[in-house]
Swiss-Prot record:
The protein's name in its UniProt record: 5-methylthioadenosine/S-adenosylhomocysteine deaminase
The keyword Magnesium belongs to this UniProt entry's keyword annotation: no
Catalytic class of the enzyme: hydrolase
Taxonomic source organism: Dictyoglomus turgidum (strain DSM 6724 / Z-1310)
Record keywords, A-Z: Hydrolase, Metal-binding, Zinc
Cofactor remark from the record: Binds 1 zinc ion per subunit.
Function in brief: Catalyzes the deamination of 5-methylthioadenosine and S-adenosyl-L-homocysteine into 5-methylthioinosine and S-inosyl-L-homocysteine, respectively. Is also able to deaminate adenosine.
EC number(s) reported in the record: 3.5.4.28, 3.5.4.31
Cofactors named for this entry: Zn(2+)
Amino-acid positions noted as binding substrate in the UniProt annotation, renumbered to this chain: E89, H179, E209, D294
PANTHER family given in the database record: AMIDOHYDROLASE-RELATED DOMAIN-CONTAINING PROTEIN, AMINOHYDROLASE SSNA-RELATED
Residues annotated for Zn(2+) binding in this entry: H60, H62, H206, D294
Length: 426
């Protein structure tokens, strides 16, 4: 299949290239040039008044929690979890997770997110939804080490990895996911580390999300979560650490030296009153940072454009520094950095020889005029509804805002029904 995107502007490694033509051959970007005289083109997409940029990457979410969107808001975290979310999650079925995941994938595609990292339950159903939809994902079975036999818990994650890692021609990756230091004792974490080394897998975990978590871990082990994880060797394998809100300068050095990828979830951290991660210091120490939404019950959407704008504005205010996290840095966090953290090589950049993983943003709208600086407009003005076309591995998943593979109406109907049936269930 040879696709030609004509007359398009291209965001390429920090610059905007105007009036280009992108030739896609199968799943690869074959050529970016001003030449239009290509032979044997199967499909043409008009790119006038559009910008092509790498598809967005959500580095941390719990996708099927779409079913709980708006169910419990404006509550303290402990009450939110113990009285609202956990009792409902205990009633989830595999089919609930399947439809909740498809709803989340619909939302993400419509907003230009083409890859995500997910940690939840019934992950075979999430993998099935990813497989059917055409997007990319790094999936993990959330493992609570204190909830039973450690070997049985670990085997759930291992079996899932054996079945799904590198499935769908590499579109699906698997990480092992010990939930967090406060739910996974060192004895369990050491088993996870050994298995990750044996299977050549990365690890996805929550780390230093709240002040209470950090203080509790210090009281139990005499170390902060980051120092504890460093001591037991977690960072000797590739790690995706979600949140890292409460980390000091020395811990940031550890994250940098060990190459830990951090999923920064600014909106969820604010909504749950967790705090604000020291992202400026992390960037200065060259910690690789991606952006995440966290679960849609604590955000409450899967809109990476909101996270892009927030990371570029929030830290300016917190640091009282108007040049902190410039627009290009924010876009890189949401694209190139995210793909690298999730383990998708040869993606995250629009460049010849790279995977054809890209989106087209319609800039022929009032909030993109005047066009003084289109990179700034993408960060400070763009909306998820501006995304016109989504292409993953050379396959068109959405064009002119119409989903090409998923049945949006059916998915919304099924997810809505299951969400309310779940709440009624005793």
């Amino acid at each position: 299949m040879r696709i030609l995107i004509e007359n398009v502007s291209v965001f390429q490694e920090g610059d905007i290239l105007n009036n280009k033509n992108i030739l896609i051959e199968n799943d690869i970007i074959k050529e970016i040039s001003e030449d239009k005289n290509f032979e044997k083109i199967d499909y043409v997409i008009e790119g006038k008044n559009k910008i092509a940029l790498p598809g967005l990457v959500n580095t941390h979410t719990h996708l099927a929690m779409t079913l709980f969107r708006g169910f419990a808001d404006d509550l303290p975290l402990k009450e939110w979890l113990e009285e609202k979310i956990w009792p409902q999650e205990a009633k989830l079925t595999a089919e609930d997770v399947y439809w909740g995941s498809l709803l989340g994938i619909c939302e993400m595609i419509k907003g230009g997110t083409i890859a995500f990292a997910d940690m939840y339950f019934f992950m075979d159903e999430v993998a099935k939804a990813v497989s059917e939809s055409g997007v990319k994902a790094s999936l993990s079975v959330g493992m609570i080490g204190v909830s039973g036999n450690e070997n049985e818990i670990l085997n759930r994650g291992v079996n899932f990895a054996q079945n799904w890692h590198n499935a769908e021609n590499g579109r699906i990756k698997v990480m092992l996911a010990p939930h967090a230091p406060y739910t996974c004792p060192p004895s369990f974490l050491e088993k996870v580390i050994n298995k990750a080394v044996e299977m050549n897998l990365s690890i996805h975990t929550h780390l230093s999300e709240t002040y209470l978590e950090v203080e509790n871990i210090k009281n139990i082990y005499g170390l902060t979560p980051v120092r504890l994880m460093d001591r037991i060797g977690l960072f000797n394998v590739p790690v995706l650490a979600a949140h890292c809100v409460f980390v000091d300068d020395e811990e940031i050095e550890i994250l940098s030296e060990k190459g830990v990828g951090v999923a920064h979830n600014p909106q969820s951290n604010l909504k749950l009153a967790s705090g604000v991660a020291p992202v400026k210091k992390m960037v200065e120490k060259r910690v690789k940072i991606g952006l995440g939404t966290d679960g849609p019950a604590s955000n409450n959407n899967l809109d990476l454009w909101e996270e892009i704008r927030l990371v570029a504005t929030l830290h300016k205010g917190v640091e009282k520094d108007p040049v902190c996290i410039p627009a290009k840095e924010a876009l890189n966090m949401a694209t190139k950095n995210g793909m690298e953290i999730l383990g998708f090589e040869n993606s995250g950049i629009i460049k010849e020889g790279y995977k054809a993983d890209l989106i087209l943003v319609n800039i022929n709208k009032p909030h993109f005029y005047p066009r003084h600086n289109l990179i700034s407009h993408l960060v400070y003005s763009a909306l998820s509804s501006d995304v016109d076309t989504v292409i993953v591995d050379g396959k068109v998943l959405m064009e002119k805002r119409e989903l090409k593979i998923l049945d949006e109406e059916k998915i919304m109907f099924e997810a809505e029904k299951r969400a309310f049936d779940l709440i009624k269930k005793r």
